Amino acid sequence: MIYLRSSLLRSGLARDPARLCSQCFSRLSPSRRPVAVRSFFSSSRLRAGIADHESTPSTVQKTYFSANRTADGLLASLSAVNSSPRSIADNALSQGAASSESITSQSTSQELPHRRRKRLKEEAAKNNAAETELPPDASSQLSTLSSALPATSLRRKLAAFLALTKPRLSFLIVLTTTSAYGMYPISSLLTLDPSMTPLPTLSTSTLTFLYLTTGTFLSSCSANTLNMLLEPKYDALMSRTRNRPLVRGLLSRRAAVLFAIATAAAGLGLLYIGTNPTTTALSASNICLYAFVYTPLKRISVINTWVGAVVGGIPPLMGWTAAAGQTATTGHDSWRDMLFSKDSIGGWLLGGILFAWQFPHFNALSYMIREEYKAAGYRMLAWTNPAANARVALRYSLLMFPFSVGLWWVGVVGNGFLVGSTAANGWLVKEAYKFWRHQGANGSARRLFWASIWQLPILLVGGLVTKKGLWDGVWNNVFGQPVEDEDDYLWEDEDEVAEAERKMIPAKTSSS
């Protein structure tokens, strides 16, 4: 039996029947079929036994007479042989994928606890790697407005200088200062003795309020300008601050320095003239603390957040001491009397509220832009220790409750403030708890930030509305509570006068 060379079995040659003769194809046939010879003596049963499984075509075709008809079966067998490795490979791949999936599921089910925690932590970090960018602050918006104006325009310069002041932050400081001024108890004014000190009239209290408002705003402008002067290089690395006037070159450093000095001198001068030296000293200390302690400390230690909270807690004390200065008597108007007397407790409680509020507000803000703080080199808990960042926010949110209750306890506000402050503080604590629970993920940081934005004005306005003694007369008239009869005071005055006259008559007779 003669076999073909192995080269003839290659797929390329097998697919080209023109290069092989009929004898070679017949030898390559997998099963050699016996030739059916037509005979008069062969029956149909014998012919059926001789024929193979392939049925004879019912009609005579051209290929029936071809000598190479066996090539058809041979080519079909060769193509099946050539395609079999591919099918085997595909089956192997599908089986391998199925086995890998089963192995993966089995390994996941048998995953060790510490590896599972690590995997979940990495997945959470990937899902929450980037927060939505915050909108630009007021300084950036004013810088954009200034850059769009002509270079010689006066409006361009005014917008650039106003951008140095951080208008929103300055407005918040003025709001907290004037709120404390307005919450100073009316009872202190009612108990004054006109013979000892003149009562403050509407004109003097209004002037004091204007001096306090203007002086506080100018002092805040100076502190914010000094802050921008000390870190333009780092402001350029953050999206929220890279559009500030000194970063963009809208103002020179010399102009910014002169502006900071001028606003500080004007602000402190107005506070000294219109309020008292204690309020002026508090404002000056706040400028120095913010510009020369807090600003450089941001690149050194995470303690900068606590220093910044102290800066935020001083303005309510300024408003309280400004109001206390109007009722201070001669010899009782020193800084010790205004800051450490019994009447100063309300001011310290308001300062404590602002101190505690800084942490949920700033920790949520810093978490949303933690990568920018990290790139700029600012040491913030948001990226150095995110877990502690969330814990601190929750802890100081809870501290808002005792400070608010303390204002009611010492008689600064009425019962309505107790209800309103509990609701507002409860909202803040709820968002702070979610921020701690989710570690800033799932939008909890943004919700806490906006909750703090709304909670503080609600608290301050609520304190002004429910101020102790402000609505007593209205409350009594509406709810019909009995009012002490004025006739009782008249009868008491007549009795006192009659008794005094009886005492004076014997004295006159004895002298005569």
Curated annotation (Swiss-Prot):
The chain crosses the membrane at residues 171-191, 207-229, 255-275, 300-320, 345-365, 399-419, 448-468. Residues 91-116, 123-142 are annotated as: Disordered. Residues 1-47 form a transit peptide. One of its GO terms (biological process) is heme A biosynthetic process. It is a multi-pass membrane protein. One of its GO terms (molecular function) is protoheme IX farnesyltransferase activity. Its main location: mitochondrion. It catalyses: heme b + (2E,6E)-farnesyl diphosphate + H2O = Fe(II)-heme o + diphosphate. InterPro entries: Protohaem_IX_farnesylTrfase (IPR006369), Protohaem_IX_farnesylTrfase_mt (IPR016315), UbiA_prenyltransferase (IPR000537), UbiA_prenylTrfase_CS (IPR030470), UbiA_sf (IPR044878). Its EC number is 2.5.1.141. The keyword Transferase applies. Pfam families: UbiA. One of its GO terms (cellular component) is mitochondrial membrane. It is found in: Mitochondrion membrane. Keywords: Heme biosynthesis, Membrane, Mitochondrion, Transferase, Transit peptide, Transmembrane, Transmembrane helix. It comes from the Eukaryota. Residues 97-111, 126-142 have a biased composition (Low complexity). Belongs to the UbiA prenyltransferase family. Converts protoheme IX and farnesyl diphosphate to heme O. This is Protoheme IX farnesyltransferase, mitochondrial. It comes from Aspergillus fumigatus (strain ATCC MYA-4609 / CBS 101355 / FGSC A1100 / Af293).
